[in-house]
Amino acid sequence: MTFSFHKMHGLGNDFIVLDARKNPIQMNPALAQALSNRHTGIGCDQLIIIGNGKNQADVSMEIWNADGSEVEACGNATRCVPVFLGRDVIISTAAGLLDARLSDEGACVDMGRPRLSWDEIPLAYAMDTLSMPVAWEDLKEPTAVNMGNPHVVFVVDDVDAVDFGRLGNMIEHDQLFPERINVNIVMVTGKDHLKMRTWERGAGLTRACGTGACATFVAAKRRRLVSGKTQIDLPGGRLVLDENSEGHIIMRGPATYVFKGEADWASFS
């Protein structure tokens, strides 16, 4: 039996998009891995399933990592939804409702309020999340933020000088993080201007991470490295972050439709 899929990306963070509004899709870890495999499948960082919404939500969104794990939130994926549908939408996710609107940049998303207490990240035990008293070699004293999924943010002198593939993997799987962790490194490049990289939980090094950019903005504000609307440069391009009067994090950036294809479910069983 064949099915249609769509490829999209947000700053190079690429997705398989499956529209399940008319025909529901029962995803599982093995199938998500098979579809996401860049050598034997379609290939992506994450798999997005758009379904019907309930109550306040126009649509629902499931997000599956390339390793087969399901995750609560993905900022770049969220920006893709209004672009895919061609309209503003309220999206139901495992992290709650998200307001995603079309904008001149591509899409603008209200990512909600950050969660900052140790048990909301979550961490394995209580500690200050502003400057955590831990270190992994030269990466020291990160700030922890939950933006629908868990992040740590390290401030460094040069994001390109860090052996990030090795250290990111090490930190992701540390016992301090019972649900594993997304790892971000950031440097200040100017007034309200940052440069960052992300090791994404379940996906590895990615060209962009929307929730990572949100978490990095929150960490930078908490550390008084930025004061207002901030431009953040990632390997795949630029996002603009701000905080509204209600303490919600607002993310603006591009989302790009690439192509539509067809495949046979039997190829991935």
UniProtKB/Swiss-Prot annotation:
What GO biological process terms are annotated to this protein in UniProt?
lysine biosynthetic process via diaminopimelate
* Primary location: cytoplasm
**Superkingdom to which the source organism belongs:** Bacteria
A GO molecular function term, named singly, is: diaminopimelate epimerase activity
Look up the record and report any one GO term of the cellular component aspect. Answer: cytosol
Q: Where in the cell is it found?
A: Cytoplasm
**EC supergroup of this enzyme:** isomerase
Q: In which pathway does it act?
A: Amino-acid biosynthesis; L-lysine biosynthesis via DAP pathway; DL-2,6-diaminopimelate from LL-2,6-diaminopimelate: step 1/1
| Record keywords, A-Z | Amino-acid biosynthesis, Cytoplasm, Isomerase, Lysine biosynthesis
What positions does the entry give for substrate binding?
N13, Q46, N65, G75, N76, N149, N182, E200, R201, G210, T211
Short name of one Pfam family: DAP_epimerase
Gene3D superfamilies according to UniProt: Diaminopimelate Epimerase, Chain A, domain 1 (3.10.310.10)
Q: Which reaction does it catalyse?
A: (2S,6S)-2,6-diaminopimelate = meso-2,6-diaminopimelate
Q: InterPro entries from the xrefs?
A: DAP_epimerase_AS (IPR018510), DAP_epimerase_DapF (IPR001653)
Record site: Could be important to modulate the pK values of the two catalytic cysteine residues: H151, E200
Q: Which EC numbers does the record give? A: 5.1.1.7
List the active site. C74 (proton donor), C209 (proton acceptor)
Q: What does this protein do?
A: Catalyzes the stereoinversion of LL-2,6-diaminopimelate (L,L-DAP) to meso-diaminopimelate (meso-DAP), a precursor of L-lysine and an essential component of the bacterial peptidoglycan.
Subunit-level organization: Homodimer.
The family annotation for this protein states:
Belongs to the diaminopimelate epimerase family.
Q: What is this protein called?
A: Diaminopimelate epimerase
